[in-house]
Curated annotation (Swiss-Prot):
Reaction equation(s) it catalyzes: L-lysyl-[protein] + 3 S-adenosyl-L-methionine = N(6),N(6),N(6)-trimethyl-L-lysyl-[protein] + 3 S-adenosyl-L-homocysteine + 3 H(+)
Keyword Cytoplasm annotated: yes
GO MF terms, alphabetically ordered: protein-lysine N-methyltransferase activity
Gene assigned in the entry: prmA
Subcellular location: Cytoplasm
EC number: 2.1.1.-
Protein known as: Ribosomal protein L11 methyltransferase
Single GO biological process annotation from the record: methylation
KW 4Fe-4S (keyword) present: no
Residues annotated for S-adenosyl-L-methionine binding in this entry: T161, G182, D204, N247
Family that this chain belongs to: Belongs to the methyltransferase superfamily. PrmA family.
A Pfam family recorded for this sequence: PrmA
Lineage top rank: taxon: Bacteria
Role, per record: Methylates ribosomal protein L11.
């Protein structure tokens, strides 16, 4: 079977929206090539993470790559995609160059080409994430999580995921009851379990994500601690939980904040990640308006993660 490889050149803040546009045209996932990764200081207190090949990255901006079935592709689709990407400016997102390129691709490129972008990554002081096909020998005391993203998800090396993992390492207490909202591959739920959580509930609206997360959790021997289920954010959950972590779009976090306050007792913690700098002020205002206090703010490039505490008293039962 032949595929059409579509590339969109955009900005970091518009990546998620561009991915959604490509999914509307039949993509089951995207590869994100951010030129900033080439200049980001990867050698930090965790040591060298991995070497990046400049040939795989654009000279500037962010390239979003997807594979679409050739049987459903028409040449005018490129223009349609470009129009929709440029229209993101109307909702406050910088679309950048918004150029669209496409070419025919072989079956093996679609099936395996994306794997070259994933390598073992030391994401916190004691945690490394590795794809299933890579060999890796951990150092003493190092925890390794093995992830098979398939073609629909990343391996947990996106800056927003790394910020979420670092936030978890800072605030998670042994035995905590944790909810991972929008779990994707299950990486945050797995990390919480490995860091000592007592019980973890991983939620996602996408049944594909639920299936992938369950496989990854079983592969890492965490099924006794982590439960995965299909759910729309925190709708219908009773709680209480000690910690809610959500690495999702700012707009979705805004929708979730009231329910987070409901399922978290006074003193409970929310980690809100996936927020672009341009949206951080709006999210912070909503958090404060709903009774949360900001305890810490983590940043990486264009991305912001809030660690907040619920200050509202627990509801009184009558």
């Amino acid at each position: 079977m032949q595929w059409v490889e579509v590339e969109v050149l955009t900005t970091a803040e518009a990546v998620e929206a561009v991915a959604v546009i490509l999914e509307d045209y039949g993509a089951t996932g995207v590869v994100i090539e951010d030129s900033a990764d080439l200049t980001r200081k990867w050698e930090d207190r965790y040591g060298e993470i991995y070497a990046l090949d400049p040939a795989n990255y654009p000279a500037s901006g962010v390239r979003v790559r997807a594979y679409l079935p050739v049987v459903s592709w028409q040449e005018e689709r490129a223009g349609e995609i470009q129009t929709r990407v440029k229209a993101l400016a109307a909702v406050g997102l910088d679309p950048g160059a918004a150029t669209v390129r496409y070419r025919l691709a072989r079956e093996e490129e679609w099936a395996y080409g994306w794997q070259k972008y994933y390598h073992p990554v030391r994401v916190t002081k004691g945690l490394t994430i590795k794809p299933t096909w890579e060999e890796y020998t951990p150092s003493p005391g190092e925890t390794v999580i093995e992830i098979d993203p398939g073609m629909a998800f990343g391996t947990g090396t996106h800056p927003t995921t790394i910020l979420s993992l670092q936030a978890l390492e800072r605030v998670l207490k042994p035995g905590a009851r944790v909810v991972d909202v929008g779990c994707g591959t299950g990486i945050l739920a797995l990390a919480a379990a490995k860091m000592g959580a007592g019980a973890v509930l991983a939620l996602d609206l996408d049944p594909v994500a639920v299936a992938v997360a369950r496989k990854n959790i079983a592969r890492n021997g965490a099924a006794d601690k982590v439960t995965v289920r299909n759910n729309d954010l925190l709708a219908g959950l009773e709680g209480p939980f000690d910690l809610v972590v959500a690495n999702i779009l700012a707009e979705v976090i805004l929708k979730m904040i009231p329910d987070a306050g409901r399922v978290l007792p006074a003193g409970g913690t929310l980690i809100a990640s996936g927020i672009s700098r341009g949206k951080a002020g709006v999210v912070e205002d909503a958090l404060l308006a709903n009774g949360f206090a900001v305890e810490d703010t983590l940043t990486s490039g264009e991305w912001v993660t809030f660690i907040v505490r619920n200050l509202l008293p627990d509801p009184v039962e009558c």
